[in-house]
């Protein structure tokens, strides 16, 4: 069976692995997933990520914990295949008053809502992280 929403699958795998207190979670890789993992690492939500394999690339994400609790408290998919959410630079949402981040796919690449505001671009709001 084909996967309808690979990004939602990635976020669910991360949530499930954190609930099970796993240190690493693996999944099929794609360009979008690697870009989202890079943003999560840059923002300090994950410890690291690695892409392995040539024919069927696999993305391994090293999860991060603080005092035994996951660093990521909430990970939600915003835009989905059935209902895409595109926002202009002025309408980009702030997560929990600026404490969390929205990950946005723009014409300048995948970035946080703060970086998109600084660059003056809007785009598709992929997910929110807190």
From Swiss-Prot:
Q: Which HAMAP family does the protein's record reference?
A: Ribosomal_uS8_B
Q: What role does it play? A: One of the primary rRNA binding proteins, it binds directly to 16S rRNA central domain where it helps coordinate assembly of the platform of the 30S subunit.
The UniProt entry's GO CC annotations, sorted and at most eight, read: ribonucleoprotein complex; ribosome
According to its UniProt record, what is one Pfam family this protein matches? Ribosomal_S8
Record InterPro entries: Ribosomal_uS8, Ribosomal_uS8_CS, Ribosomal_uS8_sf
What UniProt keywords apply to this chain's record, in alphabetical order? Ribonucleoprotein, Ribosomal protein, RNA-binding, rRNA-binding
| GO biological process terms held by the UniProt record | translation
Keyword check for Methyltransferase, yes or no.
no
Instruction: Identify its protein family.
Output: Belongs to the universal ribosomal protein uS8 family.
One GO MF annotation is: rRNA binding
What's this protein's name? Small ribosomal subunit protein uS8
Q: Which PROSITE patterns does the record associate with it?
A: RIBOSOMAL_S8 (PS00053)
> Subunit structure of this entry?
Part of the 30S ribosomal subunit. Contacts proteins S5 and S12.
Source organism: Pseudomonas putida (strain W619)
Which gene produces this protein? rpsH
Lineage: superkingdom: Bacteria
**Is RNA-binding one of the keywords UniProt gives this record?**
yes
């Amino acid at each position: 069976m084909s996967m309808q929403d690979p990004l939602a699958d990635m976020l669910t795998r991360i949530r499930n692995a954190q609930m099970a207190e796993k240190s690493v979670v693996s999944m099929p890789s794609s360009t979008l997933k690697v870009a989202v993992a890079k943003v999560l690492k840059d923002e300090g939500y994950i410890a690291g990520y690695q892409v392995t394999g040539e024919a069927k690339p696999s993305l391994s994400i090293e999860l991060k914990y603080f005092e035994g609790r996951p660093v990521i408290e909430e990970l939600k998919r915003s835009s989905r295949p059935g209902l895409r959410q595109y926002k202009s630079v002025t309408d980009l949402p702030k997560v929990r008053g600026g404490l969390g981040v929205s990950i946005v796919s723009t014409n300048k690449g995948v970035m946080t809502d703060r970086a998109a505001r600084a660059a003056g671009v809007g785009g598709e709001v992929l997910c929110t992280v807190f």
